[in-house]
Amino acid sequence: QTVKTGFDHLEEFGVNAVQLLPVFDADNNEFEPTYNWGYNPKNFNVVDGVYSTNPKNGRTRINEFRELVAAFANNANNTRIIMDVVYNHTSTAMNSNFQALVPYYYFRTLPGGGLSNGSGCGNEFKTEAPMASKFIVESLVHWATRYKIKGFRFDLMGLVDIDTMAKAKQALYNIDPDIVIYGEGWGGYGATTLPGDKMTNSANLYANLHNEKTPG
């Protein structure tokens, strides 16, 4: 008997959801055969070239990833693709596009002027800043509409402010109420300047759920 592998094996096994490691553009050399986890994000709204047959061609990156998502969605199990998203930090703050756009606006800072590092990765994206919050929501909508992503797993979700998460949830459910949203319910590996009551962590999510279910 022929043993199916890869895509065919997942379909035969009845898998109805596949969570990918971060696939948006990371700070890596796309022409070197080295492994990268993808947790050093550089450009949040474009597919990383390492997954493309032609990294230099943006259209190829887009079309090939769309084909991947569609192939899973159209198989016997209607398998949904879930993206691991890393909006809590960037690969670098000082050399990022955000820093070039408006210096220090998009990153949390300490009273002494240094960068907050609750992520343990050198910086924290200031999700509570109005334009940063708007960027995250629109980025998620971008992936959900243009690539038909059906789920999002948030890395260090506790470092994303709860108001931004609420806006993101509403925006995604407006597109498709069946979209799956989940994440790591803690803040990271160090002190953060984001107030505790504003973190999308396990404690706050439980409290909000309890309040929603408690009358009066």
What are these regions (language model features)?
Residues 1-2, 54-57, 192-200:
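Surface-exposed intrinsically disordered loops and tails
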Residues 3-32:
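Catalytic domains of carbohydrate-active enzymes, especially glycoside hydrolases
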Residues 7, 65-69, 83, 140, ...:
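Generic structural signal for well-ordered alpha-helices
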Residues 22-32, 38-40, 45-48, 71-75, ...:
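Active-site-proximal helices and loops of the catalytic beta/alpha 8
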Residues 28-74, 91-134, 138-146:
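Aromatic- and acidic-residue-enriched carbohydrate-binding clefts of CAZyme catalytic domains
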Residues 85-90, 157:
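Conserved Walker B
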